């Protein structure tokens, strides 16, 4: 009997859908969820964010860092 293939469940994009939050550089609480404890942007394969939204998220995080709303690095 052959082994059954393992299928990973496809994660859904948290920014798609009706009740999805908008990506905004001023919403630091939302952006903090997509930054590691070292201050790095978490990749989309971990957060399940789509490519278009990941680019917008990265842009918002970088903008918030520039305006000193978020830190560049955490010690």
UniProtKB/Swiss-Prot annotation:
Disulphide bonds in the chain: none
Family: Belongs to the bacterial ribosomal protein bS18 family.
Region: Disordered, residue numbers: 1-21
GO molecular function: small ribosomal subunit rRNA binding; structural constituent of ribosome
Subunit structure: Part of the 30S ribosomal subunit. Forms a tight heterodimer with protein bS6.
Classification via PROSITE patterns: RIBOSOMAL_S18
UniProt keyword annotation of Ribonucleoprotein present: yes
Protein name: Small ribosomal subunit protein bS18
Keyword entries, A-Z: Ribonucleoprotein, Ribosomal protein, RNA-binding, rRNA-binding
Function description: Binds as a heterodimer with protein bS6 to the central domain of the 16S rRNA, where it helps stabilize the platform of the 30S subunit.
Pfam families per UniProt: Ribosomal_S18
Gene name of the encoded protein: rpsR
Gene Ontology BP annotations: translation
Highest taxon of source: Bacteria
UniProt-listed HAMAP family: Ribosomal_bS18 (MF_00270)
InterPro entries named in the record: Ribosomal_bS18, Ribosomal_bS18_CS, Ribosomal_bS18_sf
One of the record's GO cellular component terms: cytosolic small ribosomal subunit
Gene3D superfamilies the record matches: Ribosomal protein S18
Record field: compositional bias (Basic residues): 1-11
């Amino acid at each position: 009997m052959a082994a059954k293939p393992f299928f990973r469940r496809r994660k859904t994009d948290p920014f798609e859908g009706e009740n999805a939050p908008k990506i905004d550089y001023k919403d630091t609480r939302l952006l903090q969820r997509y930054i590691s404890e070292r201050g790095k942007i978490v990749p989309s394969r971990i957060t399940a964010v789509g490519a278009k939204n990941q680019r917008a998220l990265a842009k918002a995080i970088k903008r918030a860092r520039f305006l000193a709303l978020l830190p560049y690095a955490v010690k």
